[in-house]
């Protein structure tokens, strides 16, 4: 009966006490760990923004948080296996018991008492052999899930706690010795274990505990001093504002995963290359980082540390954009293109072939984000162009025309050049032909230092490249100003210049006239687009800076040219007049 009671005790402890408790603890730990994950991520971002940690340390801490969540999630599932193992052991025990008795009675013709005695004894022996490893497994799982997390590994914690005091080893020594002298027990193994534990306890009692405590105290003090010195505020710890950055919600982070081919990184690199080539200046690197303050499928674009735009897109879907050849409607979530606001449908990846067959343009999430970044960055290029870019631009000029570069540096200082270059970039004029631009600036700087007039002279020299995108078969279709409006604006500009020095793009205008521009300029733009023409407004040279500024405000995409910027070989076709 001793064996039976032992088996029942092991079953009770294993199933009711150990596995039940470990299962409950693992469930609670997993839930609490996952619930606390956003807060931990926000704390890491706060420390990073405050300069308490650097980017590498923040990345390491994020990985630790993710690993902890994965661990407790895995242990939650593992506890189900452990509990299932205990239940399976009980079921196997019952099957062996009932099956053995039945075999003894019906196959071997034993009496019920003899069969019960024989097969119960065999079942208990098998059950003990199976339940002891199961109990050890359950206990190990319980120890892991109930452990308080710190910076040490579990083996280190167990060793420190078991060997924390010699009295623990002395107690174990006494128990081993008592077992060694019990009749019927294996004397030699227990005596050896007793001697080993006693010797270990004796050696530990001889160690200077005071020295160990002093060493730990010194180590703690050193670590505190080191961390304090590393976190002192200095110029190096103050984070610099990044010119361009892209923040991603955690569901979009997979778009920059190396295992998936870095689709977003590749497209952003392409955007930077295209914009740099088109404008003749090197665009700053576009930094991509995760931001747990954003919604899971949200991203935000920052220019010089300020949020320029943001959007929320389904991370696991494709964007189906209707075209002129589209027929029918495809099932999906209706929405708008983040960059241009066009109506689109978000579809599953499995619907891609169907959407293409129906005439839709299918765009993946990485391309959607890259297109949005391209649109935003292009509108901020003048703000991103700075003094260092002038240096790099002039270095390129020096490699092809060193004397011209020297004359340009002598004619205009960096502050004046920055205004001219930014004025050109604001109106979409590329700086690739830096030799022509520098030649004009050197010649015109002897007459004026006004950046608006200097930019106008550069535009005149680059008139063919400026008008080229709008020309169709040597014909340029334009809108002009109504004669009455042109005379009125000319008088306003002349009176402003007589009253003092006024920038041509900042001449004060009557509010009623501004309201008129606000309504008529978009109309001109839409009418020309509806006719399949590029929106172009042709105006007198002295009015072009002012009207170009209003066009950027009221009708982005409406290009304003002056009469003298139209090459002589082109034929003008006047489509209408701006009233």
Swiss-Prot record:
Source taxon at top rank: Bacteria
One GO CC annotation:
plasma membrane
UniProt-listed PROSITE patterns: FHIPEP (PS00994)
Q: Check the record and name the Gene3D superfamilies matching this protein.
A: FHIPEP family, domain 1 (3.40.30.60), FHIPEP family, domain 3 (1.10.8.540), FHIPEP family, domain 4 (3.40.50.12790)
Note the topology in the membrane: Multi-pass membrane protein
- For this protein, the parts annotated as crossing the membrane are 86-106, 124-144, 177-197
Disulfide bond positions: none
**Which GO biological process entries does UniProt record here?**
bacterial-type flagellum assembly; protein secretion
Return the InterPro entries for the record.
Answer: FHIPEP_1 (IPR042194), FHIPEP_3 (IPR042193), FHIPEP_4 (IPR042196), FHIPEP_CS (IPR025505), T3SS_FHIPEP (IPR001712)
Q: Where in the cell is it found?
A: Cell inner membrane
What's the short name of a Pfam family annotated to this entry?
A: FHIPEP
Arranged from A to Z, the UniProt key words for this protein are: Cell inner membrane, Cell membrane, Membrane, Transmembrane, Transmembrane helix
* PANTHER family xrefs: FLAGELLAR BIOSYNTHESIS PROTEIN FLHA-RELATED, FLAGELLAR EXPORT PROTEIN, MEMBRANE FLHA SUBUNIT-RELATED
**Which family is this protein grouped under?**
Belongs to the FHIPEP (flagella/HR/invasion proteins export pore) family.
User: What name has this protein been given in UniProt?
Assistant: Putative truncated flagellar export/assembly protein LfhA
Originating organism:
Escherichia coli (strain K12)
Q: Which classification does the entry list for the species? A: Bacteria, Pseudomonadati, Pseudomonadota, Gammaproteobacteria, Enterobacterales
Q: Which gene encodes it?
A: lfhA
């Amino acid at each position: 009966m001793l064996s039976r009671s032992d088996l029942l005790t092991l079953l009770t402890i294993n199933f009711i006490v150990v596995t039940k408790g470990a299962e409950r603890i693992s469930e609670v730990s997993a839930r609490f760990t996952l619930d606390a994950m956003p807060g931990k991520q926000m704390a890491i971002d706060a420390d990073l923004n405050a300069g308490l940690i650097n980017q590498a340390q923040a990345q390491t801490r994020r990985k630790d948080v993710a690993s902890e969540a994965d661990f407790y999630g895995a242990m939650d599932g593992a506890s189900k296996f452990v509990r299932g193992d205990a239940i399976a052991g009980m079921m196997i025990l019952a099957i062996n018991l009932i099956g053995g008795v039945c075999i003894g009675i019906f196959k071997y013709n034993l009496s019920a008492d003899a069969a019960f005695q024989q097969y119960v004894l065999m079942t208990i022996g098998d059950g003990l052999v199976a339940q002891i490893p199961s109990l050890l497994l359950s206990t190990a799982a319980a120890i892991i899930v109930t452990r308080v997390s710190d910076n040490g590994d579990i083996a280190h914690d167990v060793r420190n706690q078991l060997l924390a005091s010699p009295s623990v080893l002395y107690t174990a020594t006494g128990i081993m010795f008592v077992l060694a002298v019990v009749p019927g027990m294996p004397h030699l193994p227990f005596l050896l274990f007793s001697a080993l534990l006693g010797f270990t306890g004796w050696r530990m009692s001889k160690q200077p505990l005071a020295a160990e405590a002093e060493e730990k105290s010194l180590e703690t003090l050193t670590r505190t001093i080191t961390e304090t010195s590393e976190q002192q505020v200095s110029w190096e710890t103050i984070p610099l504002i990044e010119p361009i950055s892209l923040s991603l919600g955690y569901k979009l982070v997979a778009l920059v995963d190396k295992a998936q081919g870095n689709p977003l990184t590749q497209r952003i690199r392409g955007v930077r290359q295209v914009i740099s080539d088109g404008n003749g200046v090197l665009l700053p690197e576009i930094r991509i980082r995760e931001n747990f303050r954003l919604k899971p499928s949200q991203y935000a674009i920052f220019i010089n540390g300020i949020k320029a735009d943001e959007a929320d897109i389904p991370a696991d879907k494709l964007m189906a954009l209707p075209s002129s050849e589209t027929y029918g409607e495809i099932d999906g979530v209706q929405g708008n293109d983040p960059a241009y606001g066009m109506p689109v449908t978000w579809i599953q990846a499995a619907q891609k072939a169907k959407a293409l067959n129906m005439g839709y343009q299918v765009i993946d999430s990485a391309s959607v984000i890259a297109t949005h970044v391209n649109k935003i960055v292009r509108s901020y290029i003048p703000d991103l162009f700075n003094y260092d870019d002038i240096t790099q631009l002039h270095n390129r000029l020096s490699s092809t025309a060193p004397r011209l570069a020297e004359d340009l540096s002598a004619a205009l200082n960096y502050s004046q050049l920055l205004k001219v270059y930014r004025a050109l970039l604001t109106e979409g004029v590329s700086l690739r032909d830096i030799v022509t631009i520098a030649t004009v600036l050197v010649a015109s700087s002897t007459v004026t230092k006004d950046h608006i007039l200097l930019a106008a002279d550069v535009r005149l020299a680059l008139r063919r490249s400026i008008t080229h995108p709008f020309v169709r078969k040597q014909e340029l279709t334009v809108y002009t100003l109504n004669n009455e409006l042109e005379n009125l604006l000319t008088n306003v500009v002349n009176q402003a210049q007589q009253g003092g020095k006024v920038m041509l793009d900042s001449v004060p205008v009557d509010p009623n006239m501004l309201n008129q521009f606000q309504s008529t300029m978009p109309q001109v733009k839409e009418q020309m687009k509806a006719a399949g023409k590029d929106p172009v407004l042709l105006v007198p040279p002295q009015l072009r800076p002012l009207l170009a500024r209003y066009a950027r405000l009221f009708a982005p995409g409406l290009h304003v040219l002056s009469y003298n910027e139209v090459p002589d070989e082109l034929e003008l076709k006047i489509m209408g007049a701006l009233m």
